[in-house]
Amino acid sequence: MGYLVVIGVIACVAYGILQVVSTVLPRLLLVPSQNWQDKIKKEIEQPMVRYLKVGNKRSSYRRRLVLASKQPSFYTNFVNNKIKVASVDSQNDEGEFLAEMKKRDVRDPQRKIIYGFFHPYANNGGGGERVLWQAVQATLATSDRNIVAIYTTNYESDPTSILDKVEAKFQISRLDEDRIVFVYLRKYARLIDGDYWKRFTLIGQLFGSMVLSWEAMFELSPDVWIDTIGLPGSYLLVSLVLKIPIMSYVHYPIIQPEMFNKLKFQGLSQIRVPKLSEIKTDVFSIGKLIYWSGVFYFYKYLGSLVNITLANGSWTFNHISNIWTINKDEAGYEMDILYPPCGTETLTKNVETLGSRENKLLFIAQFRPEKRHSLILRQYSKFLVNATSIGTPLKNIPTLVFLGSCRTPDDTKTLHDLKQEVDDLELNGYVEFVVDCSYEDIMVWLSKVKFGLNAMWNEHFGIGVVEYMSRGVIPLCHASAGPLLDIVTNWDNEPTSVSWYNNTGFFFKDKSDPDFDLSLQSDTASEFLQFSSRDNKDSTSTYPTLARLLDELFITNPDLISETRLQSMRENGVKSVLEKFSNGVFTLKWMQYSNQLGDLEKSYREERRSGIEKVY
């Protein structure tokens, strides 16, 4: 009987919490106080500009002001979290401003929509930010009624400086700045930083993004939620409280089934009674399995709250489509690939596909272990020993150029270790380091070398490879993920009889790859490696090691890199990246999804929000 009482109490508490989340909080965020019109009218009529007294109703007041304003960007909280009426609005053209705030009908063709972009590091200037700002430009271009809210933790930078950086870094200009509202998140920014969580990092960051999303909604609740950075914890409160459409641009899944392969117990069925000497380690392993399983299924649930999922490439799409499966058959749900905008319209301008280039292997990457510079050095050394032993002319031997940046002390240490390895392998005359150079210098390098390297295993996309091909550099890539599936692909579907090269580039694998399977090798001494085919697990594909690939290109079969063939490959590569990775292609596709979100927003208002915005 006592158990029933406990269960009843728990059920009542859970029901009460659900009612608060689904009923009370939406009114807090979306419905202003009953006398809101009088308050705003009073401030408009005041001769001096004063702050509105809105208490904890900041979101609802800011929403109405933003949606009615001729200059929505004025209502940023950069200076402080207080709200005042913009002078352009307080001029109050015969009550037009107040009247505009009352327009709440779902089917009103003039009704404006706030697209909220949740991207805490909006000012960082990386690949994720390029996606963000190209998406912002496309959203604004879709309709004059669209307003964009940027939720950012970069509170040290004012809106103007952020937009100036966007133009300088990504060449994204002509943004309608008046329709971009910056919402600065100051309280909980640290909670999404992986370094903040010394233990249980994944669940900590999920919790942190949930809390940060609450701060975002409390300052300004949007009509559509767009996550362009990969913080799925934000979806929970957005879905439960605001009941609005959610779109997620996924750069990579935060947890994948393959990660369980690292665990001692990969499923409950593998757990056994431990030996006395193994009790401690087994208990820890079981705990780790439970933790990872909990995170995995929570992530799976969060994916069910998303209406439109866009993956940055085939590798991400294949993984996320196998994880976010709960709502696959739901009406209106969509999952697709949308390659990131790489600015190939600009990159391919004046590219030289004719003429000779320097016989160098350029590797552009940050100095981090996962980029596998060390693998390149070891394989290059092996190739060099073979090339010199058979008397290959020095002019036919390519040299290495490592070009990259050091953003952290760890990067600097990696660079130091690589230089030491060059000494140990006696490669000083063959390897050049270019550190922290300018973008202009990078363009010079891309315009003068023949070949570009990429050695990372399962790089989700690989924008560096796109840059190689855009500037006529022939890619030599690790055969995995983005470079294999999306970027270095056969132009114009020209048939090929081998797996390790096509009409745009070359591929290699390595025995150190996590997916290398010794049992598949017919000759363990061979430098041509067998890997399970990505299309048919019962068949295999053959790839050379990097050392063997260099042997093939520069010693055994130099016709593969004759000047005539290289010219053709450059032309194919330029056409390929223009067709798939231009800003224009991204923009057109994003605009389609912006329209879909607008349609979903209407149906959500009618079916899920019960007319709450019409209160007062």
Curated annotation (Swiss-Prot):
GDP-Man:Man(3)GlcNAc(2)-PP-Dol alpha-1,2-mannosyltransferase that operates in the biosynthetic pathway of dolichol-linked oligosaccharides, the glycan precursors employed in protein asparagine (N)-glycosylation. The assembly of dolichol-linked oligosaccharides begins on the cytosolic side of the endoplasmic reticulum membrane and finishes in its lumen. The sequential addition of sugars to dolichol pyrophosphate produces dolichol-linked oligosaccharides containing fourteen sugars, including two GlcNAcs, nine mannoses and three glucoses. The keyword Transmembrane helix applies. It is an enzyme of class 2 (transferase). It comes from the Eukaryota. SUPFAM superfamilies: UDP-Glycosyltransferase/glycogen phosphorylase. The keyword Endoplasmic reticulum applies. Its EC number is 2.4.1.131. Its main location: endoplasmic reticulum. One of its GO terms (cellular component) is endoplasmic reticulum membrane. Pathway: Protein modification; protein glycosylation. The chain crosses the membrane at residues 2-21. Belongs to the glycosyltransferase group 1 family. GO terms for molecular function: GDP-Man:Man3GlcNAc2-PP-Dol alpha-1,2-mannosyltransferase activity. One of its GO terms (biological process) is dolichol-linked oligosaccharide biosynthetic process. PANTHER family: GDP-MAN:MAN(3)GLCNAC(2)-PP-DOL ALPHA-1,2-MANNOSYLTRANSFERASE (PTHR45919:SF1). Residues 22-199, 221-460, 482-616 are cytoplasmic. This is GDP-Man:Man(3)GlcNAc(2)-PP-Dol alpha-1,2-mannosyltransferase. It comes from Debaryomyces hansenii (strain ATCC 36239 / CBS 767 / BCRC 21394 / JCM 1990 / NBRC 0083 / IGC 2968). Keywords: Endoplasmic reticulum, Glycosyltransferase, Membrane, Transferase, Transmembrane, Transmembrane helix. Residues 1 are lumenal. It catalyses: an alpha-D-Man-(1->3)-[alpha-D-Man-(1->6)]-beta-D-Man-(1->4)-beta-D-GlcNAc-(1->4)-alpha-D-GlcNAc-diphospho-di-trans,poly-cis-dolichol + 2 GDP-alpha-D-mannose = an alpha-D-Man-(1->2)-alpha-D-Man-(1->2)-alpha-D-Man-(1->3)-[alpha-D-Man-(1->6)]-beta-D-Man-(1->4)-beta-D-GlcNAc-(1->4)-alpha-D-GlcNAc-diphospho-di-trans,poly-cis-dolichol + 2 GDP + 2 H(+). InterPro entries: ALG11, ALG11_N, Glyco_trans_1. It is found in: Endoplasmic reticulum membrane.
